[in-house]
Amino acid sequence: MAILNTKIVSGELIGVTSATQLPDIACNRVTLKAQQDNPTFVYIGGAGVTKAGGSTNATTGIQLDASEQITLEISNLNLLYRICDATGDDLTYIAETSAA
């Protein structure tokens, strides 16, 4: 089945240890994948996302181990934030956008 009027955008984001917004890319769907050689975890969530800390809270992001991925239907990557356990925890993305 052909997908018409679609553009694919992909990239890599280096690991950061403070909550950081993803790029401003309008999209319909995005797949985020933790790099295969990441030593620890990447967390994906909303503004103010935090790492898992062993307590109940409303800010801990979805944890991605090395090679794990998540696909979301979302209107813009910039609605998501990431935080990593270490600066070596990189994240890749591939987003489906409407072609202009």
Walk through the language-model features, giving the residues of each.
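Residue-level detector of conserved, well-ordered beta-strand and adjacent loop positions
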Residues: S10, G45, D65
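Low-complexity intrinsically disordered segments
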Residues: C84, D90-A100
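Surface-exposed ligand/attachment interfaces on beta-rich extracellular proteins
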Residues: A2-A26
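Short, surface-exposed beta-strand/strand-loop-strand elements in extracellular ectodomains
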Residues: Q35-T56, T92-I94
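Noncatalytic modules at the cell exterior or secretory-pathway interfaces
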Residues: N28-V30, L72-D89
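Beta-sandwich interaction modules
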Residues: G61-L77
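Forkhead-associated
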Residues: I25-D37
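N-terminal compositionally biased, intrinsically disordered segments and leader/signal-like regions
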Residues: K7, S18-Q21, L32, K51, ...
